[in-house]
Design a protein with these regions (language model features):
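Alpha-helical, hydrophobic structural elements that either
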Residues: 1-278
Length: 278
């Protein structure tokens, strides 16, 4: 007869201190067995597919297929010194720049939530992606990575005149800055008083349009102490739109050092693979 239940038996002396366990006492746990369809078990295959574009290498390492989802594992690395991959897509990512899984008939499988641990800044960057399950009779799939964001070297210094300025004043700048391979524009700045009485200098930035396969989408403020600073991002363009830095009272000029430009690189990195060999 088919077994429907098993019992796990363990002597208490193996689980408790000797003073608490009777010599012949046992701990028992009944475990019911549930019949499952073979399709509930994951089938997986190693892929080892590689594509390099614009100094960024993407390896499609493996795929697994279950009734609930299709999971893919990728590795992203930079082939240029001083450049590190930061994330797949952009920081504020519209769907069109996120990876997609497509079958031979052009059907796109929706992405599923997945804990993408280790998503930010390592070289190489290893990431899992999950999609809706594919039919068991599927034969060919295509995995497409449209955009990868990398951190490149680069520094720029912005000087903002503050003499005679008070909280609430707007300062017109229209200053061009060269950061790595890209040019950005500091449009204006505003002094704002916080509720706790401290001053913030908010600088509005225009990081510019996409240029070929590249787009400047972000940067960082270089400072010994950035406590209290913040950034604002434009959800439509996926680009940084403003930075804020704390200011001391009576400053005549603010010197803001910008570095670590974040660049979105447009591929596509495309991988075709067979499901039938799983």
């Amino acid at each position: 007869a088919e077994t429907r239940e098993v019992t796990l038996v363990a002597p208490l002396r193996a689980l408790l201190p000797p003073a608490l366990a009777e010599s012949d006492a046992e701990w028992r746990l009944s475990i019911p067995l549930v019949a499952v369809d073979a399709a509930d078990f994951a089938s997986a295959k190693e892929l080892h597919l590689t594509q390099s574009k614009y100094g960024v290498r993407v390896d499609l390492i493996a795929a697994s297929f279950t009734r609930e989802s299709t999971a893919l594992s990728i590795r992203v690395s930079s082939e240029r010194e001083g450049v590190s991959p930061v994330c797949v897509g952009k920081r504020l990512t519209p769907d069109e720049v996120m990876p997609r899984l497509v079958n031979a008939q052009g059907q796109v499988y929706g992405r599923k939530p997945l804990d993408e641990g280790g998503r930010w800044l390592s070289n190489p960057l290893e990431l899992p992606f999950a999609f809706e399950p594919v039919p068991r009779d599927a034969k060919q799939l295509q995995f497409v990575v449209p955009v990868i964001s990398v951190e490149e070297p680069g520094e720029a210094t912005l000087r903002v005149p503050l003499a005679g300025r008070r909280a609430g004043d707007e300062i017109q700048l229209d200053t061009k800055l060269h950061l790595g391979q890209h040019t950005l524009r500091a449009e204006s700045a505003t002094l704002e008083r916080r509720e706790d009485g401290r001053l913030d200098l908010i600088v509005n930035l225009d990081l510019g349009p996409r240029e070929g396969d590249r787009q400047l989408v972000g940067l960082e403020v270089a400072a010994a102490d950035t406590f209290g600073s913040w950034q604002s991002w434009d959800g439509r363009s996926g680009q940084l739109s403003a930075v804020s830095v704390p200011m001391a009272e009576g400053e005549q000029e603010a010197t803001i050092k910008l570095h670590k430009p974040l660049i979105a690189i447009y591929g596509d990195w495309t991988f075709d693979f067979s499901v039938s060999e799983q």
